[in-house]
Swiss-Prot record:
The keyword Nucleotidyltransferase is annotated on this UniProt entry: no
Protein name: Probable transcriptional regulatory protein BBR47_14810
Family stated for the protein in its record: Belongs to the TACO1 family. YeeN subfamily.
Cystine crosslinks: none
Cross-referenced SUPFAM superfamilies: YebC-like
Keyword Ubl conjugation recorded: no
NCBIfam families: PRK00110.1, PRK12378.1, YebC/PmpR family DNA-binding transcriptional regulator
Location of the protein in the cell: Cytoplasm
GO molecular function annotations of the record: DNA binding
Main location: cytoplasm
Highest rank taxon of the organism: Bacteria
A GO biological-process term: regulation of DNA-templated transcription
Recorded GO CC terms: cytosol
Higher taxonomy: Bacteria, Bacillati, Bacillota, Bacilli, Bacillales
Length: 239
């Protein structure tokens, strides 16, 4: 699959830790999930998935509780899920997922980030068809064969199971997130190094060193926007 998930998560967490941006993003996502359904994760599948993802980033309990309490308290703040698609240099493709309380603010900010950093926004659907919605799990302490056996016994289908730097990485269809995680937990997995819902590129491209530097600047500009939750792309950054 070309991506070292533990490295990517650690790099992202390291980048965001100084500003607590990652905590703020999870706080927003938890609030939205809790407000759209029940504030109890046992009866709200979407909320449970967000909380499981937040756990792998060590999001403080206080932030989680505050977001859920805000939803319980009947806050009238509403957010919209938005997806933008675009292109970077040399055939690179980018998907930007945002969660915003002001649609009129977000679109111009995303467009400006593209335009100022050598990219351009495309129309809806222009690149998403080249990505697959994917659940990704990372775990340690078991071999890929042991993980495969656990999943087979639970009758849960996955796309691939790989070993990476002492960890096992499991790829599955996005809608299988809960089924895969429950099967692994029932099979004795107590902690996950990675638990993500992502858009995985069907094919990756490589860029020359100078072009990659420009591309990374574009990705940084998009990720630095407050309304942006996730940025996906099809470039092999050598991580």
């Amino acid at each position: 699959m070309g991506r070292k998930w533990n490295n990517i998560k650690e790099k992202k967490a390291s980048k965001d830790a100084s500003t607590s941006r990652i905590y703020a993003r999870f706080g927003k996502e938890i609030y939205v999930a809790a407000k759209q359904g029940e504030p109890d994760p046992e009866s709200n599948r979407a909320l449970k998935v967000v909380l499981e993802r937040a756990k792998t980033y060590s999001v403080p309990k206080a932030i989680i509780d505050r977001a859920i309490d805000k939803a319980k308290g009947g806050s009238d703040e509403t957010f919209s899920d938005l997806r933008y698609e675009g292109f970077g240099p040399n055939g690179s493709m980018i998907i930007v997922d945002a969660l915003t309380n002001n649609v009129n603010r977000t679109a111009p900010e995303v467009r400006a980030a593209f335009n100022k950093n050598g990219g351009n926004m495309g129309v809806s659907g222009s690149v998403a068809y080249m990505f697959d919605p994917t659940a990704v799990f990372g775990l340690e302490g078991k071999s890929s064969d042991e993980v495969l056996e656990i999943l087979m016994e639970a009758d849960v289908d996955v796309r691939d199971i790989l070993e990476e730097d002492g960890a096992v990485i499991v790829y599955a269809d996005a809608e299988q997130f809960h089924a895969v995680q429950e099967a692994l937990k029932n099979g004795g997995v107590s902690e996950f190094t990675v638990a993500e819902l992502t858009m995985l590129p069907q094919n990756e491209v490589t860029l020359t060193e100078d072009v990659q530097a420009q591309f990374e600047k574009l990705i940084d500009a998009l990720e630095d926007l407050d309304d942006v939750q996730q940025v996906y792309h099809n470039v092999d950054l050598g991580e």
